[in-house]
């Protein structure tokens, strides 16, 4: 097909079915439950953990399974509007194992001059970019890890998705939203402490987060209705929106 230059600008869309979203956080906080509420979601089940949820899922326990599932989704003969990869960590491990097997090596570093790392990164980038370009929403679930960051003036701890750096950098470049699932504690007037699960959506030195849609406040409850409501409203003015949603 011939390539032509555009004559009109694109129109931003608020539909979650067009967004690529990374959700990460500690175990059992509700990442998969939250993802299951995205429009017409189908899970690529890369690790156990969905037995307590009523969802559409296809087991993808090898990279060949994963690629086959991608091909089925890309064909378009289905009712789904959102692809959920649960978890991205296991998907990357399968990708690495597949590439290593093809080149008859045990570890990515076994090939000279960094070729093993490059082969894995290229395959990872190729497949994720293809998925993100499909006309569906894409939700990527990852675990969280605390990493020590050293600077010239000191060091600090940053919470980030538990992917290797080479895999994480590919993902961060693709997504529209990076949602960090966290908890906050509140103490009432009687001294009773309660814990609330929240989403952090804006960049911060101590955790990875981001929202290029401009529709989310800094923090909001880990509640899909509260999250989805933001996509039925105008974009958020981040200069005036505070943490009022978390009370």
Per-region residue spans from a language model:
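Short, well-ordered beta-strand core segments
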Residues: 41-43, 138, 178-180
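Conserved, well-folded catalytic cores of nucleic-acid-processing
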Residues: 72-76, 94, 130, 170, ...
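Conserved P-loop
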Residues: 2-96
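A general structural signal for short secondary-structure junctions and capping/turn motifs
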Residues: 13-14, 33-35, 130-131, 168-172, ...
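An acidic- and aromatic-residue-enriched active-site/binding cleft used to recognize and process polar
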Residues: 26, 88, 143-144, 183
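Conserved GTP-binding G-domain of TRAFAC-class P-loop NTPases and closely related GTPase folds
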Residues: 146-247
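P-loop NTPase motor core
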Residues: 90-169
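Long, low-complexity, intrinsically disordered polar/charged segments
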Residues: 74-112, 175, 227-228, 232
